[in-house]
Amino acid sequence: MENAVFVSEFFNLGDELERLGVFDAVINTDSPFFINVLRLKQTTVPELSHSYEKINAFFSDIMRLLCASQEKGDRMYREALRRFDFSGVNGINLGFSESGVDAGFGRILSQKVIGDAYDIVKAGSTQPEIFQLVGLFEENVAADRLSDMIATLIKEDIINYTRRINEQLSLNESTYPQITFV
């Protein structure tokens, strides 16, 4: 991470992020870290305390659609595929993107994952957590893409957390008028 600029450096925060237990992200490139869904299950961060349930609720809906599907390509299957739309979430700066734009899941990879999920459902499993294991049964799906998927589902929670931390640190348009804050 040559020439990496950390949030703490950019805003001259000293050790405030560490004191608050906040990740000191690199702002000009991705940090090689990922969202760990199992940590979300146990988090005490208020804004993220329901994120794990939100993720499972989303995938439970996908599983219900696949259960109701009679064959690959029918209406219920297509609806599951339509909902399984995960472009990368820009701005959280996690993963391995060199361009700063996260890849997420493309159409072909989404079709493959939903096709495999359909086969798993038809074999008898309807647990939404199966999507947390997608990297084990699908090529080209590693922690980076899984993290993008999770970030897409909990984006609002991440934004709310960021707003609270920004408020605690007085990071806003008043103190930094040259920056647009979310």
Per-segment meaning from a language model:
Residues 177:
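Conserved nucleotidyltransferase catalytic core and NTase-mimicking acidic/glycine-rich helix/loop elements
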